[in-house]
UniProtKB/Swiss-Prot annotation:
Binds calcium with a low-affinity. GO terms for cellular component: chromaffin granule; extracellular space; neuronal dense core vesicle; secretory granule; transport vesicle. This is Chromogranin-A. It comes from the Eukaryota. The modification Methionine sulfoxide is found at M361.
Length: 446
C-alpha cells in the first residue's frame, strides 16, 4: 500500500510539470521583453536599454499590436470627446450672446414705449388744461351775458309791432336775413331801439293810406345804416373771441338763437310776423327743437353760475359728448334752414321785381355788402352768406369745422398710437426670431 501511494504521488508530480512547447517558448520571450521595457521605463535615472531582439519580438506579436491599437482608439475617443465639449461650450456662448441681444432689443422697445406713453400723457394733460381754461372763459362769458339787461327791449318791440303798417310788413318780408335768429350787443340794440320809437310817430302820421314803395325803401336804407354802425362795434371784440376759441363763439351764437325774437329790432319782429306761412312754420319748428335741446342739455354747459363746485369730471365728460352731438345736428339743421330761406328769398325777389323794377335794381346793388362784410355782420344778421349757395361753412363756420376736424384727428391719432406701437414691437420681435431660427436649427443638427 505504501508503494502504491508513492507511485501515485510521483505520477501527480509528473503530470503537473509543464511541457516545453514552441508556444510556451514564444510567450516566455514576450514576457521577458515586456519585463525589460517596464524596467527601462521605471529606471529612468539609470536607464537599462532594451535589446534589439525584444523590440523585434514585441513588434511581431499580434497581441501587443492589438493592445496598442486599442490604446490609440481610446486616445482618439478622448480627443473627440474633448472637441465635442469645446464645441458645446462655444455653442452655449453663442446662444447666450443671442439671448442677450434679444433682451437688449426688447428693453430698448420697452423704453421707447414708455417714452411714448409719457409724451402722450403729457399731451393729454395739456389738452385737459386747455379745455379747463376754455370752460372757465365760457363760464365768465355766460355770467357776463346773464348780467346784461334784456327786459328793456320788450316794450318798444311791442309798441313798434302795433305801429307797423302794411307797407312795413311788406318791406320786412323782403329781408329773409331777419328770419334767422341772431345775438346782438347792447350798443346795436340801443341804436335800433332809438330808431324804432322815432319811426313810430311818422308811421302813425302817414297812416295806411301812404304809399308802400318809397316807405319800404326808406326803411331798408335806415336798417342798412344801423347795421353799418353796429358792425364796427361788434367786429373788434367778437372777432377776437371767435379767433381765440372758435367753439366758444359758436356756442354763444347757438345760445343767442332762442333769444333773438326779443333782442332783434322792432322792424325785424314785424318782418318775422309778415313772412309767408311756409317759412314761418319752418322757423317755429326749428326754434322749438332748439328750445327742447337747450332744455335737455346739462345745466353746467350753459349756466356757469349754477355750478356749486368748479369742474366735476363726470359732468364735463357728459357735456363734451353732448356738445359734439349737438354741433353736428345744429350744422345740419342750419343748412336746411338756409336752403329754405334762400328758396323763399328767391321767390320774394322775383315777385318784387315784377312789382317794382327800380327797387330790384337797388337791392341787387346792395346785396354784395352782405357777402363781403365779414363774419361779424353775417352773425348779427343770422349767419347767412348770400352769394355762397354751396358752402354752409362760410365765415365763422369754417373756423368751427376746422377746429372740430383737428380735434377728431387728435383723438384718432391718440387711439392709433398704442396699436401702432404694438405692431412695431411685434414686427421687430418677429424679425429677430427669423434671424435666430436658422442658427438654432444648425446647432440642433450639429
Amino acid at each position: 500500500s505504501a508503494a502504491a501511494l508513492a507511485l501515485l504521488l510521483c505520477a501527480g508530480q509528473v503530470i503537473a510539470l509543464p511541457v516545453n512547447s514552441p508556444m510556451n517558448k514564444g510567450d516566455t520571450e514576450v514576457m521577458k521583453c515586456i519585463v525589460e521595457v517596464i524596467s527601462d521605463t521605471l529606471s529612468k535615472p539609470s536607464p537599462m536599454p532594451v535589446s534589439q531582439e525584444c523590440f523585434e519580438t514585441l513588434r511581431g506579436d499580434e497581441r501587443i499590436l492589438s493592445i496598442l491599437r486599442h490604446q490609440n482608439l481610446l486616445k482618439e475617443l478622448q480627443d473627440l470627446a474633448l472637441q465635442g465639449a469645446k464645441e458645446r461650450s462655444h455653442q452655449q456662448k453663442k446662444q447666450s450672446s443671442y439671448e442677450d441681444e434679444l433682451s437688449e432689443v426688447l428693453e430698448k422697445q420697452n423704453d421707447q414705449a414708455e417714452l411714448k406713453e409719457g409724451t402722450e400723457e403729457a399731451s393729454s394733460k395739456e389738452a385737459a388744461e386747455k379745455r379747463g381754461d376754455s370752460k372757465e372763459v365760457e363760464k365768465n362769458d355766460e355770467d357776463a351775458d346773464g348780467a346784461k339787461p334784456q327786459a328793456s327791449l320788450e316794450p318798444p318791440x311791442x309798441x313798434e309791432a302795433e305801429d307797423q303798417t302794411p307797407g312795413e310788413e311788406e318791406a320786412a318780408s323782403t329781408h329773409p336775413l331777419a328770419s334767422l335768429p341772431s345775438k346782438k350787443r347792447p350798443g346795436a340794440q340801443a341804436e335800433e331801439d332809438h330808431e324804432g320809437p322815432s319811426q313810430g310817430p311818422v308811421d302813425r302820421e302817414k297812416g295806411p293810406s301812404a304809399e308802400q314803395g318809397p316807405q319800404a325803401e326808406r326803411e331798408e336804407e335806415e336798417e342798412a345804416e344801423a347795421g353799418e354802425k353796429a358792425v364796427p362795434e361788434e367786429e373788434g371784440p367778437r372777432s377776437e373771441a371767435f379767433d381765440s376759441h372758435p367753439s366758444l363763439g359758436y356756442k354763444e351764437m347757438q345760445r343767442g338763437w332762442p333769444q333773438a325774437p326779443a333782442m332783434d329790432g322792432a322792424g325785424k319782429t314785424g318782418a318775422e310776423e309778415a313772412q309767408p306761412p311756409e317759412g314761418k312754420g319752418a322757423r317755429e319748428h326749428s326754434r322749438q327743437e332748439e328750445e327742447e335741446e337747450t332744455a335737455g342739455a346739462p345745466q353746467g354747459l350753459f349756466r356757469g353760475g349754477k355750478r356749486g363746485e368748479p369742474a366735476q369730471e363726470e359732468e364735463e365728460r357728459l357735456s363734451e359728448e353732448w356738445e359734439n352731438a349737438k354741433r353736428w345736428s345744429k350744422m345740419d339743421r342750419l343748412a336746411k334752414e338756409l336752403t329754405a330761406e334762400k328758396r323763399l328769398q328767391g321767390e320774394e325777389e322775383e315777385e318784387e321785381e315784377e312789382e317794382d323794377p327800380d327797387r330790384s335794381m337797388k337791392l341787387s346793388f346792395r346785396a354784395p355788402a352782405y357777402g363781403f362784410r365779414g363774419p361779424g355782420l353775417q352773425l348779427r344778421r343770422g349767419w347767412r352768406p348770400s352769394s355762397r349757395e354751396d358752402s354752409v361753412e362760410a365765415g365763422l363756420p369754417l373756423q368751427v369745422r376746422x377746429y372740430l376736424e383737428e380735434k377728431k384727428e387728435e383723438e384718432g391719432s391718440a387711439n392709433r398710437r398704442p396699436e401702432d406701437q404694438e405692431l412695431e414691437s411685434l414686427s421687430a420681435i418677429e424679425a429677430e426670431l427669423e434671424k435666430v431660427a436658422p442658427q438654432l436649427q444648425s446647432l440642433r443638427r450639429g
